[in-house]
């Protein structure tokens, strides 16, 4: 890459040496443990650093990828060019009135637990969702009958050119696993959840029940991206895959889970190519058997 050393030094000036990695294998930073190298991986510690990195990206015309905690993404084996940013240091969670405010890099499960500790109800559904707050907003994450849309008040974002703005719930076009931000690629910095006072014991009982359901049904013992496919109208993706006889099948180190057919696991050092080939096998087979097109919930990014 042209100016690679210069770009690295500028990134170090902005974020500090410990927060900038070069040629970093992204399999170290995704929950599925798959992914080629990123040219530069940066972890800003302040909103100002986020803005400065964005301006640097603009100055050099670099490709840019924002990654949450790597839970809902497959990075191809060729990796990611330019700058990859994770906001793991921006992870504060606090309360103002009945609102819980969280920075983008906080774990959505941690926000759910914080709400419980504060005797606030509304985020129980998120107690088992693997992902960052920013990722949860982008995907309008949901589970067990609840979704982000139900409790979101507003978000603070940075545009890709480095401008700050506030967007209200109704401006975010939150739908089933989609949002305006998933199309504009604005960077979520801070989120305000509007919750209600509740009974601690009742909130905890609901969270315990949802956690039990999740642990008993999902293959949490292996790396995965979580739920691979969106729910097709009138069907359940996992049931279609199960009825297609695909459990235990796959390519290379990737395999359709025998515990929950909606999950594809990294059973043995799978590559992105293995994982994507397994996805395509599932889609093709389900289409042939049932005439249903399975749409991806997971994002596939990076170079071949």
UniProtKB/Swiss-Prot annotation:
Its EC number is 1.3.1.98. It catalyses: UDP-N-acetyl-alpha-D-muramate + NADP(+) = UDP-N-acetyl-3-O-(1-carboxyvinyl)-alpha-D-glucosamine + NADPH + H(+). GO terms for molecular function: FAD binding; UDP-N-acetylmuramate dehydrogenase activity. Its cofactor is FAD. It comes from the Bacteria. Its main location: cytoplasm. Belongs to the MurB family. This is UDP-N-acetylenolpyruvoylglucosamine reductase. It comes from Geobacillus kaustophilus (strain HTA426). The lineage of its organism: Bacteria, Bacillati, Bacillota, Bacilli, Bacillales. The gene is murB.
């Amino acid at each position: 890459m042209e100016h690679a050393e210069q770009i690295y030094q500028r990134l170090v000036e902005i974020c500090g040496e410990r927060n900038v990695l070069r040629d970093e294998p992204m399999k170290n930073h995704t929950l599925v443990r798959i992914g080629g190298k990123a040219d530069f991986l940066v972890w800003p510690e302040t909103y100002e650093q986020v803005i400065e990195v964005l301006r640097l990206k603009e100055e050099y015309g670099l490709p840019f990828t924002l990654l949450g905690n790597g839970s809902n993404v497959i990075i191809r084996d060729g990796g990611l060019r330019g700058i990859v940013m994770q906001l793991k240091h921006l992870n504060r969670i606090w309360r103002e009135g009945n609102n819980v405010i969280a920075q983008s890099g906080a774990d959505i499960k941690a926000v759910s637990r914080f709400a419980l500790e504060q005797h606030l109800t509304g985020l129980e559904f998120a107690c088992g969702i693997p992902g960052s707050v920013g990722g949860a907003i982008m995907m309008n994450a949901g589970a067990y009958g609840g979704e982000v849309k139900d409790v979101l008040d507003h978000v603070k974002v940075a545009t890709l050119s480095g401008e700050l703005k506030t967007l209200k719930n109704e401006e975010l076009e939150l739908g089933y696993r989609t949002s305006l931000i998933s199309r504009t690629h604005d960077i979520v910095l801070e989120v305000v959840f509007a919750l209600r006072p509740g009974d601690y014991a009742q909130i905890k009982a609901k969270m315990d029940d949802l956690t039990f359901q999740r642990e008993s049904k999902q293959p949490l013992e292996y790396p995965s991206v979580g739920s691979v496919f969106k729910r097709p109208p009138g069907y359940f993706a996992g049931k279609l895959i199960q009825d297609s006889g695909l459990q235990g099948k796959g390519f290379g180190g990737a395999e359709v889970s025998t515990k929950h057919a909606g999950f594809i696991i990294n059973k043995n050092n799978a590559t992105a190519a293995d994982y994507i080939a397994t996805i395509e096998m599932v889609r093709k087979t389900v289409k042939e058997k049932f005439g249903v097109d399975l749409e991806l919930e997971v994002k596939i990014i990076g170079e071949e």
